[in-house]
UniProtKB/Swiss-Prot annotation:
Species for this entry: Prochlorococcus marinus (strain AS9601)
Function description: Specifically methylates position 2 of adenine 2503 in 23S rRNA and position 2 of adenine 37 in tRNAs.
HAMAP family reported in the protein's UniProt record: RNA_methyltr_RlmN
CDD domains for the chain: Radical_SAM
Compartment(s) where it occurs, according to its Swiss-Prot or TrEMBL record: Cytoplasm
Lineage of the organism: Bacteria, Bacillati, Cyanobacteriota, Cyanophyceae, Synechococcales
Protein name: Probable dual-specificity RNA methyltransferase RlmN
Length: 348
């Protein structure tokens, strides 16, 4: 352990003891990291620690932050997109989405993404690597400092496929819950759905977190297998009917309903027949549908569905007994909305 971010009180007490310090020095480090949320995440800034202890930690390579801000982009609606650089000079983006009572942090779990969904900017440049838990957590601290308020909600809907980084994902969730004091019920993990990984997520959550109270969101985006394969190449490996069965098992094991994300693409998946197919697919188990308007990116020719089609689609789902919401896009003027995050500054 060299990065202190993500460490528990016990971890930090042990660090202090290893250096011949009293255990309370570890608690001081813990308070400095999580309770004060300092921007200067530098060992030198922990002035409550003896100077010689700080120097030894620095010499031995301990640190609190690995990321550096490269760009800040503030949208007209108050949404903030940050372009961050890692120690190995890769780039990731994260987004702070404010409302009057909440600040939602949209976090990246990987540098890039291997899934290559046809409507999403992130996958156009492929996957570089997965993020460490400390790099995931650091995004929260930067959002909080830049927006001068505490994050209340977390969505893993930034760059990357979270279930392909499942161990670091769950370690970060454990720290978000235990150390950042954000309830699991205010955390959403979004996945395009990877074979066998939904059941693995449930099992590993009980191992690492002792329970599973976060929300699982499936990026479904289609009501039938043929359509899904045209917009999500990886869908060829995981049929919709199997995704639904695995989600039903997840609900039984965790007691948590599943959300299904459905991006409305004009002429592709927005007809009433698609709404009927989706209703039949989801009928009979605990779930919720989020309808999302498409956010334009340069490389593809998909178009937003009309507001009329969106409303008709929603009404048909409601009439068929499906719980549904319309998700409002935020940060559009700064390419900070769903599907628009990238690895570099081209997205400005």
């Amino acid at each position: 352990m060299k990065n202190l971010l993500g460490s528990s009180i016990n971890d930090l007490e042990n660090v202090a003891l290893d250096y011949g310090q009293a255990a309370f020095r570890g608690r001081q480090i813990y308070n400095w990291i999580y309770n004060y949320r300092n921007k200067n995440k530098n060992i030198d800034q922990i002035e409550v620690l003896p100077l010689d202890f700080r120097e030894k930690l620095k010499v031995d390579g301990f640190k609190v932050s690995e990321l550096v801000i490269k760009e800040r982009n503030l949208a007209n609606d108050g949404t903030l997109k940050l372009l961050l650089s890692t120690e190995d000079n890769e780039s990731i983006e994260c987004v702070g989405i404010p409302t009057e009572k909440r600040l939602t942090a949209c976090l990246s779990s990987q540098v890039g993404c291997p899934m290559d969904c046809k409507f999403c900017a992130t996958g156009k440049e492929g996957l570089k690597r997965s993020l460490k838990a400390s790099e995931i957590l650091d995004q929260i601290l930067f959002i909080e400092y830049e927006m001068n308020r505490k994050v209340t909600n977390i969505v893993f809907m930034g760059m990357g496929e979270p279930l392909l980084n499942i161990d670091e994902l769950l370690l970060s969730i454990r720290s978000i819950n235990n150390d950042f004091q954000i309830s699991q019920r205010k955390i959403t993990v979004s996945t395009v759905a990877i074979p066998k990984m939904i059941s693995k997520l449930s099992a590993k959550s009980f191992q690492i977190l002792s329970n599973c109270q976060f929300t699982l969101a499936i990026s479904l985006h289609a009501s039938n297998q043929k359509t899904r394969e045209t917009i999500i190449p990886s869908a060829k490996n995981y049929e919709i009917k199997n995704i639904i069965e695995d989600c039903k098992t997840f609900v039984r094991e965790t007691g948590r309903r599943v959300s299904f994300e459905y991006l409305m693409l004009s002429g592709v998946n927005d007809k009433l027949e698609h709404a009927c197919e989706l209703s039949n697919l989801l009928k009979g188990f605990q779930c919720h549908v989020n309808l999302i308007q498409y956010n334009q990116i340069d490389e593809v020719e998909f178009q937003r569905t009309s507001l009329k089609n969106l409303q008709l689609f929603q009404s048909r789902l409601v009439n068929n007994g499906i719980a549904v919401s319309l998700r409002k896009s935020r940060g559009l003027d700064k390419n900070a909305a769903c599907g628009q995050l990238r690895q570099n500054a081209k997205s400005k």
